[in-house]
């Protein structure tokens, strides 16, 4: 069966060539978002320090000080996402990119290629660029019309929110932060591909804090050799798909707790 490349990156390059004013407005929006992320990261540092201090003093999830610290951290996350929403909405209302003749033409060609496909494969790569290009061309609704097989960063964009995370960085321990909202095709979860490589999952406090922070969304670790189908059923390696719990453990992913989503499958 032939594979058709939707060529989203090349499509955006074409928009850069024929609609420089629109692309400049998009770049200004992205620059404003980057500036907000600087404030967001500064706020995260302080908020996470409070969470870790409360956990260290009383290693109980029910500790009211820990719960309050988690709520503060969640408020920081929500503030960032609200600011990101504001910038995206402002750009859409002011520039109306999907109504721009150049975007209509290029987007139409993308949708024509997609219409002839029996399924959509979404690979990984730079999840931020992937999410931005898909969003720029308004592929949200088109994603719901096809069976999807996605892995790594491709799986991340299908969830409600996209979390960047890495406990092992060149400058020490990294801090998890939201990149943006995902497309919400798989509700109720945040996907964490290659979590074993990127997170200190052997430390119960790390697992518990991240799970508490993301609640009520469920953090699901995706490892090589396994996946989740459209009905929430896991396949492949039994230990490849696990959920981080607020008790500090990794548990088998339980589809009974998952809200039904679209026809999609996520893999590491």
Name each model-derived stretch.
Residues 119-120, 147-148, 218:
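Beta-sheet entry/capping signal
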Residues 113, 123-126, 131-202:
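Class I SAM-dependent methyltransferase SAM-binding "motif I" and its flanking Rossmann-like core
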Residues 1, 5-77, 164, 168-268:
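C-terminal and late-domain segments of enzyme folds
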Residues 63-143:
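Active-site periphery "cap/insert" segments of enzyme catalytic domains
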């Amino acid at each position: 069966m032939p594979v058709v490349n939707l060529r989203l990156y090349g499509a955006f390059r074409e928009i850069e060539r024929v609609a420089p004013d629109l692309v400049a407005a998009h770049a200004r929006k992205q620059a404003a978002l980057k500036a907000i992320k600087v404030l967001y990261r500064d706020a995260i540092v302080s908020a996470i320090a409070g969470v870790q201090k409360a956990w260290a003093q009383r290693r109980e999830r029910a500790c009211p000080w820990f719960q309050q610290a988690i709520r503060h951290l969640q408020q920081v996350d929500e503030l960032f996402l609200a600011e990101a929403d504001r910038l995206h909405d402002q750009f859409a209302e002011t520039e109306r990119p999907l109504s721009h003749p150049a975007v209509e033409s290029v987007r139409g060609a993308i949708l024509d290629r997609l219409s002839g496909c029996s399924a959509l494969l979404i690979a990984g790569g730079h999840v931020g660029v992937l999410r931005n290009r898909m969003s720029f061309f308004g592929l949200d609704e088109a994603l719901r019309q096809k069976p999807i097989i996605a892995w790594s960063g491709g799986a991340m964009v299908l969830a409600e929110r996209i979390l960047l995370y890495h406990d092992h960085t060149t400058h020490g321990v990294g801090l998890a932060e939201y990149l943006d909202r995902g497309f919400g095709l798989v509700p109720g979860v945040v996907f964490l591909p290659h979590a074993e490589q990127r997170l200190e999952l052997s430390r119960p406090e790390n697992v518990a804090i991240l799970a508490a922070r993301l609640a009520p969304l469920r953090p699901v670790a995706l490892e090589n050799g396994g996946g989740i189908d459209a009905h929430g059923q896991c396949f492949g390696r039994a230990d490849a798909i696990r959920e981080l719990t607020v008790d500090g453990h990794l548990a088998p992913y339980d589809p009974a707790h998952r809200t039904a989503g679209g026809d999609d499958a996520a893999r590491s």
